[in-house]
From Swiss-Prot:
Organism of provenance: Bartonella quintana (strain Toulouse)
Entries under InterPro entries matching the protein: G_ENGB_dom, GTP-bd, GTP-bd_ribosome_bio_YsxC, P-loop_NTPase
GO cellular component: cytosol
Annotated EngB-type G domain residues: 31-215
Gene Ontology BP terms: division septum assembly
Biological function: Necessary for normal cell division and for the maintenance of normal septation.
Names of the cofactor(s): Mg(2+)
Amino acids binding Mg(2+): S46, T68
Binding site for GTP: 39-46, 66-70, 93-96, 160-163, 194-196
Annotated protein name in UniProt: Probable GTP-binding protein EngB
Family to which the UniProt record says this protein belongs: Belongs to the TRAFAC class TrmE-Era-EngA-EngB-Septin-like GTPase superfamily. EngB GTPase family.
Gene for this chain: engB
Tree of life domain: Bacteria
Pfam families the record matches: MMR_HSR1
Length: 215
């Protein structure tokens, strides 16, 4: 039994937002294992995090692409954060990428923050890269996957909004995506298929997260 074997109910607890990180200099000291969520703007990161912990408004959702401009940290409530009473896990909502209409200086700032975090965080156990099941992997997604490979950061693809895709199209996308991942050495081979709106694939995602932090 690992130290994380008893955490199966952790996603039923109340979770809280603890801080937003606008630049790499504001990162908290490395402590509990971190699980990060990356994806294009409006791919559904905030909605998926809310569904994951069964809270409607933990992570802010917005119809405005690029609203999330910081690394947003969430932890289960009831831990002081002091040595000896650290939370067992932290979830990190990363700034969305691929928003072409954002000012270049903002895009550059977000890019630097994301890349610096990925390269230098030893407590980062896995990045879940969210891909809209209606569109598949786009160039911006591919660039992020290449970066994760170079940084040797373990990541796993999560297809979102699967309820909005016909079953035959979804099956085809899964096959195409798995084939593309064969060229990415840091990619976890298993795809996760989810829908925040229909609560599909959430148990599988929770189990994958617990497995990732136990490694």
């Amino acid at each position: 039994m690992t130290k994380y074997s008893s955490l199966s109910g952790i996603f039923s607890r109340k979770w809280i937002f603890i801080r937003g990180i606008p630049t790499i200099h504001f990162l908290p000291p490395e402590g509990p294992p971190e699980i990060a969520f990356a994806g294009r703007s409006n791919v559904g990161k905030s909605s998926l995090i809310n569904a994951l912990v069964q809270q409607k408004s933990l992570a802010r959702t917005s119809n405005t692409p690029g609203r999330t401009q910081e690394l947003n940290y969430f932890v289960p409530d009831g831990f002081s954060g002091e040595p000896g009473n650290l939370p067992p896990i932290a979830l990190v909502d990363m700034p969305g990428y691929g928003f072409a209409e954002a000012p270049k200086n903002l895009v550059d700032a977000w890019t630097h923050l994301i890349f610096s975090y990925l390269r230098g965080r030893t407590t980062l156990k896995r990045v879940y890269v969210l891909i809209d099941s209606r569109h598949g992997i786009k160039k911006n997604d591919g660039d992020v996957l290449d970066l994760l490979d170079k940084a040797a950061v373990s990541y796993q693809i999560v297809l979102t909004k699967s309820d909005k895709t016909k079953s035959n199209e979804l099956a085809k996308l899964i096959m195409i995506t798995k084939t593309k991942l064969l060229k990415h050495p840091a990619a976890y081979p298993e795809l996760l298929v989810t829908s925040s709106e229909k609560a599909l694939g959430l148990e599988e995602l929770r189990a994958a997260i617990l497995q990732a932090i136990a490694v």
